[in-house]
A protein has these predicted regions:
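Short glycine/serine-rich loop segments
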Residues: 146-188
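Basic nucleic-acid-binding alpha-helical/helix-turn surface characteristic of O6-alkylguanine DNA
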Residues: 2-3, 8-146, 192-197
Length: 197
């Protein structure tokens, strides 16, 4: 249950923080216009997408095409609009954050997920740059000490790489564990945040 009497109560409490409503989540973005752009950064190809309310996807990979297919799968009912010059500033801010994460990213988010996922994502946003937390520690912070696997699943479902810093979650012994954007990218991000690169 994630500590709320219902999903609606969680969404009411967090709508200003993470954005997308349950209806929009279930409808695959129906009625949404999502602007996106694909660029290159030091971690590879990066796709940044946003609704009028905020960033809804930051996807990182080796090639642009799989990133676009991922976005289309996430929002099959949305109108996707690419290559708009006025969106370049947003993309530049995200890339700047990837390159220098200690500077922070001051952009609104509009992400979709279950009440539990969104609760995990909010907890992740409270982990400062340069720090790490284990899946178990994060579950304990949520008041759910036995939910480490569920926390890992929520991290894997994170649609906004770096803005919701699931790369800051490590194994209990401090070693790196899986990262949907690639373990080497996770290592690079953590080193940057620690000031090692």
């Amino acid at each position: 249950q994630a500590g709320f009497g219902s999903s609606a109560r969680f969404y009411d409490a967090s709508a200003g923080l993470l954005g997308m409503t349950p209806g929009s989540y279930r409808a695959g973005g129906q009625g949404e216009t999502i602007r996106f752009a694909i660029a290159q950064c030091s971690l590879g190809a990066i796709l940044v997408a946003a609704t009028p309310r905020g960033i809804c996807a930051i996807l990182i990979g080796d090639e642009p095409e799989p990133l676009l297919r991922d976005l289309e799968a996430r929002f099959p009912q949305a109108e996707l609009v690419g290559a708009q010059a006025d969106f370049e500033r947003t993309v530049a801010q995200v890339i700047g954050f990837v390159e220098a994460p200690r500077l922070g990213l001051d952009l609104p988010l509009d992400v979709r997920g279950t009440a539990f996922q969104r609760r995990v994502w909010e907890a992740l946003r409270a982990v400062p740059a340069g720090a790490t937390v284990s899946y178990r520690e994060l579950a304990e912070r949520l008041g759910m000490p036995g939910a480490a696997r569920a926390v890992a699943g929520a991290c894997a479902a994170n649609p906004v790489a770096v803005a919701i810093p699931c790369h800051r979650v490590v194994r209990l012994d401090g070693t790196l564990s899986g990262y949907r954007w690639g373990i080497e990218r996770k290592r690079t991000l953590l080193e940057r945040e620690a000031g090692k690169s």
